[in-house]
Structures are given as C-alpha cells and as structure tokens.
C-alpha cells in the first residue's frame, strides 16, 4: 500500500465523576505513610508484572516499608499463581496485594489512590490503561514496549526499559517525591490527554478526514503520504 495514511489516536472519554478533586478524595483512603504503586490489566506473561516484583526485592528494608504494590486484574490463572509464588519466595507478602478484577468507578478510585501506575509490558499497541490513569491525575511508568514516549516528553511519568534494575530506580524516585510533586506530574498528564486524546477532539479529526476524502481540499496534518 502506497496511498495516504491517517494517524488518529484512540479516543479517551473523561468520566464525569473523575476529576482532580475526585483523586484528592480517593487519596484519603490509601494506606497512610506509604506510597502506593499498582498494575491494572490482564494478567498475562506479556505484561511482565514479575519485573515489578523483582524490582521491589531490590529495595532495602526501610524503602520496602514505605511502599505497597497492588496487582489488579485477572486472566491467566497459571500466571497469577506464578506471581503469587514469586511474592512468597521473595518474602514480599506484606507489600504486595492481589486485588482481582475491578471495573467501573472502582477502577478509577484505585487508579486515583496510586502514586504511579506501572506498565512494564513487553509490548502494547496503545495501552488504554495509560490515559485512564493520567485522567485520574496519576503519573505512569511505561516500558519502551509501549508507544508512550510522551510520558517523559511532558514530564508526567517515565518511559524506560522494563528491566528490574530500571524499575527500581523509578520506584526510588517515586519514594523520594512528595505528594505535591506527584500531583503536579498528574496534572500535566491529565492536560496531555485532554489536549490530544479527548474523544471530542478525535471525533473532529475523523470529521476532517472524511471532509478531505470527499472534497480533496485541506488535507489534515495527520494524513501522511509515502
């Protein structure tokens, strides 16, 4: 194929209930004195959740006391059993909680309680959970196997490799940040999604694309030719 190609992002809907004030309310219910990180998604080996667990095992005792990790999701029972076994083997039961599947408002509540969402996947085409966390005002760590370089470009998260040694550096950075710094990152992330991915904006891009196809006038800037 050598014709025009339109590059249009996935649309992201901002739930009416989810705001920065909503996040502030949710934060009241997190474990006091601890930073909370989380994974939310389908439990499958491609997600590399174990690399977060291995990163946590690299923390010293004092650092470990300041962190909790929630694994949110279901899917592959054998993979979940493997993760649970690794948590037990590394003696991380006090720091890691398996929550199970959540949806609806509870999903946004749990995202809002996090200091950061962790996405260490080997590969993601888009990773819808990334913008869902950002609209909650939650910073995101995402691996280089995801397309989310904008996290570092807009200073609303981390886009790095998914090796445990790298992930533990991100975790240590999170542990050193105060709540106002984390909130500022989250505000920048929410603004990024509103500016580039909000569903009304994407609908406008689709409108402009079809207008160009029908009239051949005013080719949109998101249409590329080889």
Task: Please report, for each region that a protein language model flagged, where it lies by residue.
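A conserved mid-protein helix/loop that constitutes part of the nucleotide-sugar donor-binding site
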Residues: 35, 39-58, 63, 69, ...
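Short hydrophobic beta-strand element within catalytic cores of glycosyltransferases
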Residues: 139-143
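Conserved acidic donor-binding segment of nucleotide-sugar-dependent glycosyltransferases
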Residues: 157-165, 174-179
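Nucleotide-activated donor-binding/catalytic signature segment of Leloir-type glycosyltransferases, i.e.
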Residues: 81-102
């Amino acid at each position: 194929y050598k014709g025009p190609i339109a590059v249009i992002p996935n649309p992201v809907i901002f739930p009416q209930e989810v705001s920065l004030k909503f996040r502030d309310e949710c934060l009241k219910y997190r474990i006091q004195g601890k930073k909370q990180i989380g994974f939310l998604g389908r439990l499958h080996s491609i997600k590399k959740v174990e690399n977060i667990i291995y990163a946590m095992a690299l923390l010293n005792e004092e650092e470990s006391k300041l962190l909790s990790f929630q694994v949110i999701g279901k899917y592959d029972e054998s993979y979940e059993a493997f993760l649970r076994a690794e948590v037990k083997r590394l003696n991380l039961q006090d720091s890691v909680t398996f929550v199970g599947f959540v949806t609806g408002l509870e999903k946004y509540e749990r995202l809002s309680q996090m200091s950061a969402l962790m996405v260490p996947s080997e590969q993601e085409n888009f990773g819808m959970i990334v913008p869902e966390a950002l609209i909650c005002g939650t910073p995101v760590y995402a691996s280089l196997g995801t397309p989310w370089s904008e996290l570092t470009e807009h200073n609303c998260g981390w886009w790095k490799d998914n090796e445990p040694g790298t992930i533990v550096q991100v975790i240590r950075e999170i542990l050193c940040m105060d709540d106002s710094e984390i909130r500022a990152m989250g505000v920048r992330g929410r603004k990024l999604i509103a500016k580039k991915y909000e569903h009304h904006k994407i609908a406008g891009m689709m409108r402009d694309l079809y207008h160009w196809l029908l009239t051949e006038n005013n080719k949109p800037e998101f249409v590329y030719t080889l």
